[in-house]
A protein has these predicted regions:
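A short, Trp-centered hydrophobic/proline-enriched beta-strand micro-motif
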Residues: 8-23, 61-64
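A short mixed-secondary-structure module that forms the rim of ligand-binding clefts
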Residues: 34-70
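Charged, amphipathic alpha-helical segments
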Residues: 1-4, 45
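Conserved beta-strand in the GNAT
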Residues: 29-32
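General beta-strand recognition
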Residues: 17, 40-42, 73, 126
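Charged, gly/pro-rich active-site loop segments
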Residues: 73-135
Length: 135
């Protein structure tokens, strides 16, 4: 499978599971993809969440997408993107209406400091299907 096919599959199936490490304990939770293309895989979380603290301490992660019988695991290192323009772009996206509402209603004292946006560049993807299970 080529990179563009992977970007298309994960963009069409934006819910993924993110694995981090909390001291020596693995942690996994569902996340929501913002964008995946040649620049990288972008998602966000709130800075008060434990996942943000875990990534800050150890930025090596694995993302797992389930795409209609195809599992795509992508490992790599996350980089924090400090861009209010990108945070605002994310808020204006139709899939992130809840963030726009939070920003406009003052849910966070400082919205831009409360949203952490991450990018994974140059990840290593592994594609799995049941048909290829024992290969």
């Amino acid at each position: 499978m080529i990179k563009q096919d992977i970007f298309k599959l994960i963009s069409d199936n934006p819910v993924f599971y993110l694995a981090t490490v909390d001291n020596d304990q693995p942690r996994v939770r569902a996340m929501f993809l913002y964008r995946a293309d040649e620049t990288g895989i972008i998602f966000h979380t709130a800075t008060m969440k434990e996942v943000h603290e875990q990534i800050t301490k150890n930025n090596k992660v694995e993302l797992c997408f389930s795409c209609n019988g195809i599992q795509i695991r992508i490992s790599g290192e996350l980089t924090l993107i400090d861009s209010d323009d990108l945070r605002n772009e994310i808020c204006e996206h139709p899939s992130r209406k809840f963030l726009k509402d939070w920003r406009e209603k003052g849910f966070f004292e400082d919205f831009h400091k409360s949203i952490a946006v991450y990018i994974l560049k140059n990840g290593i993807a592994k594609v799995w299907t049941m048909d290829k299970n024992f290969e």
